[in-house]
Amino acid sequence: MSDERITEKPPHQQPESEGEPVPEEEVEEETEEEVPDEQSSEDDDIDGLIDELQSQEAHEEAEEDDGPAAAGEARKIPEELLQTDPSVGLSSDEVVNRRKKYGLNQMREESENLLVKFLMFFIGPIQFVMEAAAVLAAGLEDWVDFGVICGLLFLNAGVGFIQEFQAGSIVEELKKTLANTATVIRDGSVQEAPANEIVPGDILKLEDGTVIPADGRLVTEECFLQVDQSSITGESLAVDKHYGDEVFSSSTVKRGEGFMIVTATGDNTFVGRAASLVNAAAGGQGHFTEVLNGIGVILLVLVVITLLLIWTACFYRTVRIVPILRYTLGITIVGVPVGLPAVVTTTMAGGAAYLAKKQAIVQKLSAIESLAGVEILCSDKTGTLTKNKLSLHEPYTVEGVSSDDLMLTACLAASRKKKGLDAIDKAFLKSLAQYPKAKGALTKYKVLEFHPFDPVSKKVTAVVESPEGERIICVKGAPLFVLKTVEEDHPIPEDVHENYENKVAELASRGFRALGVARKRGEGHWEILGVMPCMDPPRDDTAATVNEAKRLGLSVKMLTGDAVGIAKETCRQLGLGTNIYDAERLGLGGGGSMPGSEMYDFVENADGFAEVFPQHKFAVVDILQQRGYLVAMTGDGVNDAPSLKKADTGIAVEGATDAARSAADIVFLAPGLSAIIDALKTSRQIFHRMYAYVVYRIALSLHLEIFLGLWIAILNHSLDIDLIVFIAIFADVATLAIAYDNAPFSPSPVKWNLPRLWGMSIMMGIILAAGTWITLTTMFLPKGGIIQNFGSIDGILFLEISLTENWLIFITRAVGPFWSSIPSWQLAGAVFVVDVVATMFTLFGWWSQNWTDIVTVVRIYIWSIGIFCCLGGAYYLMSESETFDRLMNGKPLKENKSTRSVEDFLASMRRVSTQHEKGN
């Protein structure tokens, strides 16, 4: 490519200031546009442009209806390497040397061994017991039991591995946010180079639409750009950039031209450091896995206690080692539910498939359980609560000026080029449909001169010719600067001046961005016309969804990069509360200046925070979690990734970046919060199914541990090992269909309440064991007791155990009495099939060496129904007990003084650490 001289004139922008409403956010080209009498061929047809914008708006709405501190320290680049001549760039040899030293411009990939990942699913308390049982079965040459146990192990690992494999790699997705190619100055010429080959010190050319591939700073004097970095900082509109300002990788140039020097690449960029924050976030096992492992440990302890009792009795009777090992195998199989991980994982996988139909993609199965218990929802504003597009509100006009007149003047002071339109211009042109007079008159005016936004005067100026041939100067811009333009021409009446300033102040306090509009006709005086407020509006369904979230026991907190005023106004419209604070009060590292306990109270009671950076979001989630809350975080940008990963449930909303999607636990393809609330209800249904199954399965384990332990210890006899294995298989096969059961959802967040769970499970297990013990012991009465004319003891006990255990699921699945909720046909059918098979086992003596007559089988059914009624009554009484209800739904205990002291100490340490880092 031939050499290209590098000259740059300062482009202009529309204004943004902190002391007043900020109108224009996207970059105009700095070069003044001189429009001759004959319209430029480059200008787009205004009617076609308006129609296209309005058509796009309608299409977007139709689709909706359907539907910088970092964890890791950046590698510093020596300043002498950042003195590249912008007109020449780096030499090819220097590029090669720097690439060798600093590497490619891409995220470092953590290699993942899929085999190791698969083998990790064989680690855990329950898995260890299952593996020990398999080894014991192999030692006894009991290959049937060995095969069944191994099959269950691999089933559990397979389901979990497949689900986790689909989640993908967070670093890989963050890498995808980088641009693909870049325009670079090397060897004195302009070249196209792959983005991953950019090195520190490279000179890059930026223009409209450029996706910036690396961090850097602008080196073109008097340049002005507007850069969309909403996916990084959360700011809803483009940000002004001047000479010497920093720009970040993965952000987009909306308007303007200039050159930048690369100061950081790959992992050292803002996005790269965000990746390190994500990787530093809690990525452990998850709350559900912790609960499951805790249950497994307790069951394992109970198994050991039972085995000690049995071994003591056997040694006292001098029982031979082989029977002792068989007893050990039997207790091991029944004591720890071999199918618990598989059934629960399958239940959640079925729920994930159901959520997928609702356009919610579950990337981690444990997220379903976490979402069901979420108490606080931290939501990003832009694109989540709002539409992420500007809309105009009711204009303020001075006396004697019509709204159409103000609208016409504002639209005349706008670019006629499609590529030159910024968010403000688009909002005005799309809103012309509401001002038919202004729309009809717009095409009759001829543009003579157009001056894009001037960052000094903070306004856009256009000189037009009316249909009558009158020369008119139209301006729009920062309200007070427009007012100053008029005042410099002639005095403004005091009442007009006062009303105008009051309106501007009111709009600023309500969080609106505002544009002042004025004009000058011919040789006359300047006229102030009024103010047009604009805002990124809330989604149509957000307010109703927020109210529904509150009814479901959720506290919603908004975290946004926008100003406090904008955040408060958005919250006011949505009913979120107005306790919105500047994130600076949290401190750079989340510590702030308040004592730790006060900071925790401050975060807990706030309705949201504005002007936040990634570390602020991360800190808010962390503080709430330390207070004992389960926290969900919604987001759509790179800046949300760390807190999405940190949260108990990370939610990537519709339109989220790849980085946010990969960091999230659940990805939504449908827009708005309504889809999240639907998923919340579904997750609570799934949680209820899991909770019912766990209570059921623990009760079954305790049932057989108690019964078999007593039988072996007292009578020196046990059920046939093969029948024990079939009981375990039948119990889990029958309940695999619970994933498709009809289940209610709780009106409040649900959690694993282990005291309540264990209390109910123990009572169910004792009643089951008592029923089976009575069945066994009354057989030896003169007339056979409950079971008369019995054939095989093993066969009868096998049937009684199978029936009562299988029917227990109908009790635990219900919220009230077992008859208050009809089970799904899948669950009822599965239990029926298992009951039929168990009956066939008993009738024909399979594995029990003797058949049983039909009369005895009927008596077993009648006796089992009686036990079932006792179980149902006891479960209902416990579920209606105030004590159990308080344990299940009670709020977390208030922190005590020692907890608050720990919070104060941790906050102090964070402040010391932050000051030390800043000092270095």
Swiss-Prot record:
SUPFAM superfamilies assigned to the protein according to its UniProt record, in alphabetical order: Calcium ATPase, transduction domain A, Calcium ATPase, transmembrane domain M, HAD-like
Sections of the chain in a coiled coil: none
Stored SMART domains: Cation_ATPase_N
Top EC class for this record: translocase
Source species, domain of life: Eukaryota
Membrane topology, Extracellular segments: 139-142, 316-326, 741-756, 848-859
Keywords: ATP-binding, Cell membrane, Hydrogen ion transport, Ion transport, Magnesium, Membrane, Metal-binding, Nucleotide-binding, Phosphoprotein, Translocase, Transmembrane, Transmembrane helix, Transport
Region annotation (Disordered) ranges: 1-71
A Pfam entry, by short name: E1-E2_ATPase
Membrane topology: Multi-pass membrane protein
Active-site residue list: D380 (4-aspartylphosphate intermediate)
Catalytic activity: ATP + H2O + H(+)(in) = ADP + phosphate + 2 H(+)(out)
EC numbers, comma separated: 7.1.2.1
Binding site for Mg(2+): D636, D640
GO cellular component: plasma membrane
Feature: compositional bias, Acidic residues: 17-50
Cytoplasmic side: 1-117, 163-293, 350-721, 777-826, 877-920
Function of the molecule: The plasma membrane ATPase of plants and fungi is a hydrogen ion pump. The proton gradient it generates drives the active transport of nutrients by H(+)-symport. The resulting external acidification and/or internal alkinization may mediate growth responses.
Protein name: Plasma membrane ATPase
Organism from which the protein derives: Zygosaccharomyces rouxii
